[in-house]
Design a protein with these regions (language model features):
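C-terminal/domain-edge helix-coil "capping" segments
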Residues: 19, 23-27, 31, 124-191
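A structural "domain/chain start" motif
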Residues: 17-83, 151, 189-191
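Structural motif marking the loop-to-transmembrane transition
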Residues: 2-3, 104, 108, 166, ...
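Short, low-complexity, polar/charged sequence segments that are solvent-exposed and flexible
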Residues: 62-66, 110-117, 157, 167-169
Length: 191
């Protein structure tokens, strides 16, 4: 009976630290909800993306157009821009997104967790690293007048017993990462 109670007490103590999750963004959303004073009356947005894009991230150029509207950098935003659109400037954007799941280390951590009957579980974090990068060329009459580049790194960390929450947390991490990237770009390209 004492052995059973001791086992239950140890199991309860171990379970306390067995779940957890966190999202780290570099750089953080320093311009979150900041509004600009219509730097341009109209912007045309072109997608020049040629790199990798994760399906879960979606169309970054379209999301960028929504962020431009929300931040009020321009009165009118045309996406996709057509040749007959009358715009002050055209933003030619190129976005990439990558994911590193650290598969090798995740396998080793899972093996050690199971091999030690979950005793080591509280010390292992499973990381999913997202990297968002983007460049925007500001064109006026077909000539580049300004260029901006930005990179955002997002790390989604979870413990083994929280791995089931990754799909829920992924959308939040991606949303915050895109917001950080777009805020960096908008800070640099507005007048």
């Amino acid at each position: 009976m004492k052995l059973k109670l001791m086992f239950i007490a140890c199991f309860t103590l171990l379970l306390v630290g067995c779940t957890g999750s966190e999202i780290k963004i570099k750089p953080e959303n320093f311009l979150l909800d900041q509004r600009f004073n219509e730097s341009y009356s109209s912007i045309g947005l072109l997608d020049a993306s040629t790199g990798k894009n994760l399906p879960s991230v979606g169309n970054l150029t379209e999301a960028f157009s929504h962020e431009i509207r929300a931040s009020r950098v321009a009165k009118d935003v045309y996406y996709p821009a057509r040749p007959d659109d009358k715009t002050d400037v055209t933003f030619e954007s190129n976005f990439n997104s990558e994911l590193d799941t650290h598969s090798g280390s995740a396998f080793a951590k899972s093996f050690l967790t199971g091999f030690t009957f979950f005793i080591l579980e509280p010390i292992f974090w499973y990381d999913f690293d997202y990297k968002f990068s983007g460049t925007v060329d500001v064109l006026k009459d077909g000539k580049v007048i300004k260029q901006s580049s930005a990179v955002t790194d997002v790390t989604l960390s979870v413990k083994w017993l929280s791995l089931g929450d990754v799909s829920k947390l992924e959308s939040e991490a991606i949303s915050q990462g895109k917001k950080s990237l777009f805020n960096q770009l908008l800070r640099d390209v507005h007048k």
